[in-house]
Structures are given as C-alpha cells and as structure tokens.
C-alpha cells in the first residue's frame, strides 16, 4: 500500500507548479509552458526579439498570466560545453528578465541541439520552412522545458543554474 511516507522512498520528488521556458534568439523568442504537474510542455507564443525592452514587457505579461513557479531559459553552449558570445547575450537578457519578474525564480538550462531537434521534428511533421520560422522558437522552448522537467523528475532538484538578481 502506498502512503506519503512510502512515496518519498520511491524516488526523487518533483515540485508541483506550472513553469515557463524561454528560447532567446536574435529575431524571435520562443515561449512554452507546462501543466501544473510538469507532465506536458506546450508552445505558448513567439515574442519578437529585436526590441528587447518590448520583449521583456511581453515576457513579464506572460509571467503574470501563467503564474509559473519558475522560468527556465535556454543557455546556448557549444557541443563541448563552452560558452561564446551567444551565451553571454542570453545571460545579459536573463539577468534583466530576472529583475523584471522577481520574486519568480529564473534558471538557465543547457539548450544544446534544441533548435536542431525542433527543426527536424517540424520537418518530419510536414511543416514548411517559411511557416516553420514562426514556430521553431516555440518548439525549441518546448524541448528546453521538457528537458528541464525530466532533469528535475530524475534528480529531485531544480534544473540548471539559478540566476541571482543583481540590482
């Protein structure tokens, strides 16, 4: 018979609550969300990314609307795990986002190969390249969120690295 005490021994615990994922790109920012149980990640929208203050405003609105327990942001790394100019740009973007949505925590998670995987998935499902541009960032955000959820499900700890708000 399963009791709360026995359930603890069954493995790591995952926090309950909706999360948002953000895939930051130069032109577009993909956003995804999950259900409160962290089972299914779904696309939310693509936010225009060239006007960074406007993008931050829209992301703050989405955080207010979805009320997530945290926001995970994909951190682009090289295949060897290093960070280049794109990662530095995402770190700056994420720092500003974290300030704007505090006290909601923001975490950076490895996003290696998510856009490639999303692109392959869209092509396999018959999405044409022109239409795909408008949803590729959302699809990448879904993959980022699914990976973050799986990481927490396995480890029982929040995924990636926390972003400290520097004022």
Curated annotation (Swiss-Prot):
Tell me a GO cellular component: cytoplasm
What UniProt keywords apply to this chain's record, in alphabetical order?
Cytoplasm, Hydrolase, Nuclease, Ribosome biogenesis
What top-level class of enzyme does the UniProt entry assign? Answer: hydrolase
- Report the EC code(s) recorded for this entry: 3.1.-.-
Q: Where in the cell is it found?
A: Cytoplasm
An example GO BP is: rRNA 5'-end processing
Top-level taxon in the UniProt lineage: Bacteria
Q: Which InterPro entries match?
A: RNaseH-like_sf, YqgF, YqgF/RNaseH-like_dom, YqgF/RNaseH-like_dom_sf
Gene Ontology molecular function = nuclease activity
NCBIfam families in the record, alphabetically?
RNAse_H_YqgF (TIGR00250)
The record's family statement is: Belongs to the YqgF nuclease family.
Quote the function comment for this protein. Answer: Could be a nuclease involved in processing of the 5'-end of pre-16S rRNA.
Q: What is this protein called?
A: Putative pre-16S rRNA nuclease
